[in-house]
Amino acid sequence: MKRVLVAMSGGVDSSVAALLLKEAGYEVVGAMMRFWPDLPPPSLEAGKPRAWESCCTPDAAYEARRVADRLGIPFYLLDYREVFEEEIISPFLQDYAQGRTPNPCARCNTFVKFGALLKQARRLGLDYVATGHYVRKEGLALLRGLDPHKDQTYFLWGTPKEALPHLLFPVGGLTKPEVRALAEKAGLPTARRPESQNLCFVAGDLKGFLKERLKPRPGPLVDALTGEVVGEHEGASLYTLGQRKGLGLYKTHLERYVVGVDPERNVVYVGPKEACYFEGLEGEGLNLLAELPEEVEVQVRYRTPPVRAKVESLSPLRLRFAHPVFAVTPGQSAVFYRGERLLGGAVIRRGLYNLAGLEDPRALTFS
């Protein structure tokens, strides 16, 4: 009998993943990785979650254990706080401090779930690690989830190629309503649990978290086209490319977007919307799960459709889009597809071929 470790989050997707694998005849072991700091014990009253409702919190651990008890499988809480701080939180803060906008969920899959956790599972003699991701797997190929509204391949581009034979994604061929229906039928306590919308390590709003950890200082908002100071920002690390709201412009009639961030000089550059459009990108940290053809589809944000692009070079990685793309943001993921198949991805270093002909704003002087 094949043995599988199911990474349980306390949500319905990983709960149903465990259910399906047990029904398929696997020997299932449930586990949750503890990422959070020491907090007060969770409320044990069913249906009364804490205000901090997210995956991998104490309340979520309680729900995951209830699911394991219902399924009759063992459940373990694994202490991954040190690994998570080193591999996820520290790089996350460093990226923001450098004016980038990171994608911690993609990094977590690469280095924690399909890195450290898989290695531990193999050491314990388990054959597979399974998750509740909406991803399909055919042989060693990863395909978009059947439910287009829930597809999560965007976050799996960094999966180590050598990990692919040991990964299972049981809910990838289902829609979210089907997953909830299976959970209801099996009497799983997570059947109606709301989806987590927050980063698992941010107890509140992201801006407040960054202010607490990075201690940003106010500084000038500079028009990238004229060099004029047009407002004051709250701290360069709090802004991202393409942002329009909350800029603090002196002249409120101006329609301006963030077009660049210079954390060294503590300057945020703003400009017209067209200055946020790019016809290409340069990437770093390329990870390929399949051969990259000369022309690919590339997705630069989770909720935006992919755009056709030509691969100009691999070292450095440079792509040219078939049409301009808004807010090609340093630190975010550029993920490559051929049809429904995930080919790999990279971290965006910078956008190329700016539609407004804008140079790197950090090279500008201002008054």
Curated annotation (Swiss-Prot):
InterPro entries referenced in this protein's UniProt entry, alphabetically: MnmA-like (IPR004506), MnmA-like_C (IPR046885), MnmA-like_central (IPR046884), MnmA-like_central_sf (IPR023382), Rossmann-like_a/b/a_fold (IPR014729)
Keyword Oxidoreductase: no
Name this polypeptide is given: tRNA-specific 2-thiouridylase MnmA
Residue(s) at site: Interaction with tRNA: H133, Q332
Molecular function, one GO term: tRNA binding
One Pfam family it belongs to: tRNA_Me_trans_M
Enzyme Commission code(s) on record: 2.8.1.13
HAMAP family tied to this protein: tRNA_thiouridyl_MnmA
One GO biological process term: tRNA wobble position uridine thiolation
Binding annotation for ATP: A7, M8, S9, G10, G11, V12, D13, S14, M33, G132
Residue span of region Interaction with tRNA: 150-152, 301-302
Main function: Catalyzes the 2-thiolation of uridine at the wobble position (U34) of tRNA, leading to the formation of s(2)U34.
Location in the cell: Cytoplasm
Reactions the enzyme catalyzes: S-sulfanyl-L-cysteinyl-[protein] + uridine(34) in tRNA + AH2 + ATP = 2-thiouridine(34) in tRNA + L-cysteinyl-[protein] + A + AMP + diphosphate + H(+)
Gene name of this polypeptide: mnmA
Top-rank EC class of the record's enzyme: transferase
Disulfide bonds listed in the record: C108-C200
Naturally occurring in which organism (per UniProt): Thermus thermophilus (strain ATCC 27634 / DSM 579 / HB8)
Family: Belongs to the MnmA/TRMU family.
Any GO CC annotation of this UniProt entry: cytoplasm
Key words of the record: ATP-binding, Cytoplasm, Disulfide bond, Nucleotide-binding, RNA-binding, Transferase, tRNA processing, tRNA-binding
Main location: cytoplasm
Record: active site: C108, C200
UniProt KW Cell cycle keyword: no
